[in-house]
Regions:
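Conserved hydrophobic/aromatic beta-strand scaffold that supports enzyme active sites
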Residues: 110-112
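N-terminal targeting sequences that direct proteins away from the cytosol to non-cytosolic compartments
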Residues: 2-107, 116-140, 144-179
Length: 179
C-alpha cells in the first residue's frame, strides 16, 4: 500500500513537471530570458535593458561598468557579410588583425568577427561631423541567422574589456534561439 502511494505521488509530480514544461517551455529552467520572439541566456556579469530605439532589442553593459557596450539588433538591412564589413570599416586596422568564424548549427547560422584597432564612432545624426576616434578599442560582432529572421550583436569597448568578455559574448550569441 505504501509503495503504491509513493508510486502515485512520483507519477503525479512527474506529470506536473511535464505539464509545466509544456506550458512554460524550458527557458525558466535554463535561466533564459525573452525579448520579442527570441530567448537568450545573459552572462552573470552583464545587465540587459530593453531598448526603445528603432531596430534595437537590447542594450547590454557590464554590471561593474567600464567602457564596454553590447547591442542586439533585429532585422536591420543587409546580409551577415555586409554588416560585418560595415563594422570592420568602423575601425582603422590591418587586415591581419581581423578574425572571422562561420558556424552552422541545426537551426541557425552564426558568423562572428573579432578585431582591434582605432574605432571611428559612427555619427548617425551628422555624417559630415569630424570623426571621433577611440584608440585601443576592440569589437566582437555576431550575426545569428534563422530561416526567416536575422539578429546582429555588436560589442565595442576597450581592448582589455573586449578580450575579457569574449567567452561571455560567444555564450550569449550561441544561446539566442527563437521562441
Amino acid at each position: 500500500m505504501v509503495n503504491r502511494f509513493i508510486s502515485l505521488v512520483v507519477a503525479l509530480l512527474f506529470c506536473g513537471f511535464i505539464s509545466f514544461i509544456a506550458i512554460n517551455g524550458t527557458n525558466e529552467i535554463y535561466g533564459k530570458k525573452e525579448v520579442q520572439n527570441i530567448s537568450y541566456k545573459l552572462p552573470d556579469s552583464w545587465i540587459a535593458n530593453v531598448s526603445d530605439k528603432q531596430f534595437r532589442l537590447l542594450e547590454l553593459s557590464l554590471i561593474e561598468g567600464g567602457d564596454f557596450s553590447v547591442v542586439l539588433f533585429a532585422n536591420i538591412q543587409g546580409t551577415a557579410d555586409q554588416n560585418i564589413d560595415r563594422w570592420v570599416n568602423q575601425f582603422q586596422i590591418e587586415n591581419s588583425n581581423i578574425e572571422t568564424i562561420k558556424d552552422t548549427l541545426s537551426s541557425k547560422y552564426i558568423s562572428t568577427v573579432e578585431l582591434y584597432g582605432t574605432y571611428e564612432v559612427p555619427n548617425m545624426v551628422n555624417r559630415n561631423a569630424p570623426k571621433e576616434l577611440r584608440t585601443e578599442y576592440g569589437l566582437l560582432g555576431g550575426v545569428i541567422e534563422f530561416g526567416n529572421s536575422i539578429y546582429f550583436v555588436k560589442a565595442v569597448g576597450k581592448n582589455d574589456l573586449i578580450k575579457a568578455n569574449k567567452s561571455n559574448f560567444n555564450e550569449f550569441i550561441y544561446s539566442i534561439s527563437l521562441k
